[in-house]
Amino acid sequence: MGAKKVDLKRLAAALPDYPFAYLITVDDGHRVHTVAVEPVLRELPDGPDGPRAVVDVGLIGGRTRQNLAHRSEVTLLWPPSDPSGYSLIVDGRAQASDAGPDDDTARCGVVPIRALLHRDAAPDSPTAAKGCLHDCVVFSVP
């Protein structure tokens, strides 16, 4: 059985509620590097497997670019506006282009591999009744 694909329509519908995100990369020493970004979902022409999109995170700096040269897997984390709200998390593969205005910056796009809403389960919720600590809504299509 293959991996599920991200439901791009649900991801696109959720994004207007989240004005900014953190782009999270990892360096060779396994240290996390986090930068604030204002991502935009851009549709791409349909591929053989259906709809495609890239999350355009805009310009990135030298350290993020160095991390991506060794590890293209990244996470985008949009925090909730309210502590009881959902965080939006997108895992994906990033690619930097050389389209920055100088040698230290580049444009970055992330192809979503997994997307979900995540928060702590409320103590009286059906999720907590099942013994789960977290309330997750995964954006996937079969």
From Swiss-Prot:
<dbReference type="InterPro" id="IPR012349">
    <property type="entry name" value="Split_barrel_FMN-bd"/>
</dbReference>
<protein>
    <recommendedName>
        <fullName>Uncharacterized protein Mb0449c</fullName>
    </recommendedName>
</protein>
